[in-house]
């Protein structure tokens, strides 16, 4: 399948054993004659070093804890994580062909975030939460509306395992959880409501369709701390164009305040 339909990239995340990455990467490179880039998402400096030595990735996606959805329970924002990973990789003194490109993830939703990531040492960025608010995203309308509604993302979201427990998606490796917008399910768990009752209410909310989302709803809205920067729904191409131009403007006037 890989030989016939060769993907541009294979993106790995949260392996149970880091050593598995070496075997997977080797197989993909052999089958695709190295036409498929190997991307690995990491959340700590130690993980970045272990992954680099295990499979020589083409790209390290350095995910800070501001990211929505799943990631490391313990870590740092990209402000500290990206430069420390960059320094640690540089200290390995790898030849250029074995030095991974760094791509920043987590808390980036506009040109300012992109500009910051590039200055910190990333070569590119990936955005998740911002693209939830585009018509191309295959999510429920209620989910999308909640992403647009939410603000003050640092206070309105939390890293937790509650949503996985309610959804039955508890097979993540140790040390991972997910960041989502706070709702009644999270509040009830924090206030000591028995899990069985919280689960019953969650399952009832599933029958409400789009009305199941929202601050008084119970459906999960995975999103990062930059959710407050998402102001409306835009086409994916328009988001890319706007963010790219915003980054150019910020970088262009970066020296004015020095």
What are these regions (language model features)?
Residues 72-103, 109-258:
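Conserved active-site-proximal phosphate/metal-binding subdomains
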Residues 41, 105-106:
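Short His-Asn-centered micro-motif
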Residues 1-96:
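Active-site entrance/lid segments in N-terminal catalytic domains of soluble metabolic enzymes
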Residues 17, 108-109:
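Gly/Ser/Thr-rich loops at beta-strand to alpha-helix junctions
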């Amino acid at each position: 399948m890989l030989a016939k339909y060769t993907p541009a990239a294979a993106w790995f995340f949260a392996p149970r054993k880091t050593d598995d990455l070496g075997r997977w990467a080797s197989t993909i490179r052999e089958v695709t004659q190295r036409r498929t880039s190997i991307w690995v998402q990491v959340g700590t400096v130690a993980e970045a070093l272990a992954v680099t030595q295990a499979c020589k990735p083409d790209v390290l996606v350095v995910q800070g804890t501001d990211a929505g959805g799943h990631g490391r329970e313990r870590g740092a924002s990209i402000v500290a994580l990206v430069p420390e990973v960059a320094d640690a990789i540089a200290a390995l003194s790898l030849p250029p062909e074995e030095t991974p490109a760094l791509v920043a993830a987590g808390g980036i939703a506009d040109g300012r975030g992109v500009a910051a990531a590039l200055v910190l040492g990333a070569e590119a960025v990936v955005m998740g939460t911002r693209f939830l608010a585009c018509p191309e995203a295959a999510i429920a309308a209620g989910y999308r509306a909640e992403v647009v509604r939410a603000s003050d993302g640092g206070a309105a979201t939390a890293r937790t395992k509650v949503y996985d427990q309610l959804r039955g998606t508890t097979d993540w490796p140790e040390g991972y959880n997910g960041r989502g917008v706070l709702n009644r399910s999270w509040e009830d768990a924090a206030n000591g409501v028995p899990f069985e009752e919280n689960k019953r209410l969650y399952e009832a909310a599933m029958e409400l369709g789009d009305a199941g989302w929202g601050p008084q709803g119970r459906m999960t809205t995975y999103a990062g701390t930059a959710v407050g920067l998402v102001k409306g729904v835009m086409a994916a191409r328009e988001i890319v164009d706007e963010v790219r131009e915003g980054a150019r403007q910020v970088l262009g006037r970066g020296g004015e305040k020095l």
